[in-house]
């Protein structure tokens, strides 16, 4: 990390300011050359003109120097706040490169912060998730995670496991000395408690992932029951073609919309029925796949049509799902001839006139999800918690069987999984993969 890196840290486009970030051993040197200053006071904003090597002015900017180790990366950092737009920040970046800086890789500033012990990989992931959060509720949950509760909990578990492993490996080295029975009981209890905590984290995160990622809602029904009209009503604009011709929607249509504080991804599916049309068959297959991926299902039926075999197929399709289903009887402003033989609690509405009741029911259901507690948005971390929990659970069983070598193996597996997120981690290839999806300048 001896080279000095530079990147534009703000989004590209027209705006009032752009920020160019510089980090490394020569950051201060480059800043002094650009500004024609002889010194900079750390953590002070300096208004200055910036010049290229031909002594031509680049811009007037605010320059802030953060002296190592008291900076985001732990290295010397200089941030330049220039006028916004496409050109000025690019010209400044080119000038920094000509002075000897290197263009930063995606996420390289955060990677250096981790390698220099300024943050854990877990906090870096939380920062990235916060940047990418799609709703106020998601941002709130992620910001809470950033306060350290999750990191402290995982580090405590990892530390417990390391201490336990030390006891057990000592016992393996000195095979004649058995572990005391009271210590064995303590270790068994520790394994049980920590496995349970990690299991709660990953199960809670999976069950409530919609609070962060957005809930997926699939609209399903036979052709021509008003699914596309319902989609348009939820979006409050005409997104899907509405026609009396059955089979108009042959592909899935997906759109995002917000309901209160919740981000929703709604999917209008092709009408499910038997068809010889190859294209329509593909659409029906996609519809069934959408149901598997959905968190919530809106099952739509037509109040103005007598229940038939195609309706029965919808009931059968949804009979064994564990997804939340809202049963909707559309076109209820017309003569109602649909017989509720399945005794479903239908929401009666007209998608072309008023869906207020459905929105209220949806919002009440979404609000019932408790946003408190520890939730993880990173799939990698969810998997790490799952792997660690299962390894510790297996270790407990092996301890009871006095298989100490295998116990140590399982504990090592759990420790290594947690260590990727809770402590300074030196395996560059894994960090490269982790931070490769970050923004430039972050």
From Swiss-Prot:
Major subcellular site: cytoplasm
Binding site for Mg(2+): 228, 249
Note describing how the cofactor binds: Binds 1 potassium ion per subunit.
Annotated compartments: Cytoplasm
Limits of the TrmE-type G domain: 214-367
Pfam families (alphabetical): MMR_HSR1, MnmE_helical, TrmE_N
Positions that bind GTP: 224-229, 243-249, 268-271
Alphabetized PROSITE patterns for the sequence: G_TRME (PS51709)
Binding-site residues for K(+), renumbered to this chain: 224, 243, 245, 248
Entry keyword set: Cytoplasm, GTP-binding, Hydrolase, Magnesium, Metal-binding, Nucleotide-binding, Potassium, tRNA processing
GO CC term (a single one): cytosol
Alphabetized InterPro entries for the sequence: G_TrmE, GTP-bd, GTP-bd_TrmE_N, GTPase_MnmE, MnmE_dom2, MnmE_helical, P-loop_NTPase, Small_GTP-bd
GO molecular function terms attached to this record: GTP binding; GTPase activity; metal ion binding
Cofactor(s) this protein requires: K(+)
Stored PANTHER family: TRNA MODIFICATION GTPASE GTPBP3 (PTHR42714), TRNA MODIFICATION GTPASE GTPBP3, MITOCHONDRIAL (PTHR42714:SF2)
Annotated HAMAP family: GTPase_MnmE
Subunit structure: Homodimer. Heterotetramer of two MnmE and two MnmG subunits.
Entries under NCBIfam families matching the protein: mnmE_trmE_thdF (TIGR00450), small_GTP (TIGR00231)
Family, as annotated: Belongs to the TRAFAC class TrmE-Era-EngA-EngB-Septin-like GTPase superfamily. TrmE GTPase family.
Protein name, entry field: tRNA modification GTPase MnmE
């Amino acid at each position: 990390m001896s080279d000095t890196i530079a990147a534009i840290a703000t989004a590209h486009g027209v705006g009032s300011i752009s920020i160019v970030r510089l980090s490394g051993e020569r950051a201060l040197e480059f800043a002094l050359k650009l500004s024609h200053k002889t010194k900079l006071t750390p953590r002070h904003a300096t208004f200055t003109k910036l010049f290229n090597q031909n002594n031509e002015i680049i811009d007037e900017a605010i320059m802030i120097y953060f002296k190592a180790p008291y900076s985001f990366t732990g290295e010397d950092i200089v941030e330049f706040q220039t006028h916004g737009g496409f050109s000025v920040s690019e010209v400044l970046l080119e000038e920094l490169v000509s002075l000897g800086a290197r263009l930063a890789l995606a996420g390289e500033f955060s990677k250096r912060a981790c390698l220099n012990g300024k943050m854990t990989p877990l906090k870096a992931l939380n920062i990235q998730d916060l940047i990418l959060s799609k709703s106020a509720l998601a941002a709130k949950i992620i910001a809470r995670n950033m306060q350290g509760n999750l990191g402290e909990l995982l580090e405590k578990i990892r530390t417990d496991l390391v201490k336990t492993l030390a006891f057990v490996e000592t016992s393996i080295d000195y095979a004649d000395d058995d572990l005391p029975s009271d210590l064995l009981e303590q270790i068994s209890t520790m394994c049980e408690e920590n496995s349970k905590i990690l299991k709660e984290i990953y199960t809670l995160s999976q069950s409530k992932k919609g609070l962060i990622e957005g809930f997926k809602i699939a609209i399903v029904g036979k052709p021509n029951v008003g699914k596309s009209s319902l989609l348009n009503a939820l979006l409050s604009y005409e997104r899907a073609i509405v026609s009396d011709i059955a089979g108009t929607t042959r592909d899935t249509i997906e759109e995002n919309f917000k309901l209160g504080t919740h981000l929703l991804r709604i999917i209008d599916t092709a009408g499910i029925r038997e068809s010889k049309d190859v294209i329509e068959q593909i659409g029906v297959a996609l519809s069934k796949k959408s149901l598997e991926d959905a968190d919530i299902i809106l099952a739509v039926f037509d109040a103005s049509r007598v229940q038939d075999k195609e309706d029965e197929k919808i009931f059968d399709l949804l009979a064994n799902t564990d997804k939340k289903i809202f049963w909707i009887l559309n076109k209820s402003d017309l003569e109602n001839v649909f017989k509720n033989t399945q005794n479903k609690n239908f929401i009666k509405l007209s998608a072309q006139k008023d869906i207020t009741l459905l929105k209220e029911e949806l919002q009440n259901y979404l609000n019932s999800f408790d946003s408190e507690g520890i939730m993880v948005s990173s799939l990698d971390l969810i998997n790490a918690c799952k792997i660690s929990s299962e390894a510790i659970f297996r270790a407990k069983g092996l301890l009871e069987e006095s298989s100490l070598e295998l116990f140590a193996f399982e504990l090592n597996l759990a420790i290594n999984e947690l260590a990727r997120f809770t402590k300074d981690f030196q395996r560059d290839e894994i960090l490269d993969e982790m931070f490769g999806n970050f923004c430039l300048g972050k």
